[in-house]
From Swiss-Prot:
It comes from Serratia proteamaculans (strain 568). NCBIfam families: PRK11239.1 (NF008413). Signal peptide: none annotated. SUPFAM superfamilies: Winged helix' DNA-binding domain. This is UPF0502 protein Spro_2794.
């Protein structure tokens, strides 16, 4: 997949996708508007504190990757930025409104369960139930031009699996699986040692009792 965004680039794209839907009268966004959106305290995970120069550098990189375009002139006193990430005239990535809502929220908040996504996308798209969110996630994970999301291993004690976008590259879960295997192996070794200690205690007790009788 040709979409390889850094975490900060993903934040900028997520903000533009979100604001295009939630505040269309303020979209496209200025440099200052994008900085405020990136550093927003709500609906962001992790919370970032990007400087204006950092945001400008990110915008310049995204322009080179053709994920953004600038709008200036015609009454605009400042340069405005709009995304070309999806649904642009000549772009290949086409997403439905529901898919845009899910992708934007994953870009802004990282891995989430379908239930969390349903709640957090409500300003961008209204899902009737969690199954609709799950269907969108299934579609995004099975697309021929994707996959764009992946189901993560369920965390211990959690009822739902989380999903993560793949626009920053593949998710490597092997370490988590290896850790689980190591934990299982360690548990087995401890159990064997406990049995051996118990047997030694029994043998020692038997020797002590025999010595007492002698």
């Amino acid at each position: 997949m040709k979409y390889e965004l850094s975490a900060k680039e993903a934040r900028v794209i997520g903000c533009l996708l979100e604001k295009q839907v939630t505040t269309p009268d303020q979209y496209p966004l200025s440099l200052n508007g994008i900085q405020l959106a990136c550093n927003q305290k709500t609906n962001r995970e992790p919370v970032m504190e990007l400087t204006e120069s950092e945001v400008q550098q990110i915008l310049d990189l995204l322009l080179k990757k053709h994920f953004l375009r600038t709008l200036s002139g015609f009454g605009n006193r400042v340069v405005k930025y709009e995304h070309r990430f999806c649904n642009s005239e000549f772009g290949q990535l086409k997403l439905s409104a529901a898919e845009v809502a899910v992708v934007a929220t994953l870009l802004l908040r990282g891995a989430q369960t379908p239930g969390e996504l349903r709640t957090r996308t409500n300003r961008m798209h209204e899902f009737n139930d969690v199954s609709e969110v799950e269907q969108v996630l299934t579609n995004l994970s099975a697309r021929e031009d994707g996959p764009f999301v992946v189901r993560l291993a369920r965390e211990p004690g959690k009822r739902e699996s989380r999903f993560m976008h793949l626009f920053c590259g593949q998710i490597d879960e092997a370490p988590a699986e290896a850790a689980l295997e190591n934990d299982t192996e360690l548990t087995q070794r401890v159990s064997v040692l406990e049995n051996e200690v118990a047997q030694l205690k029994q043998q020692l007790q038997a020797l002590l009792e025999r010595g007492t009788h002698d």
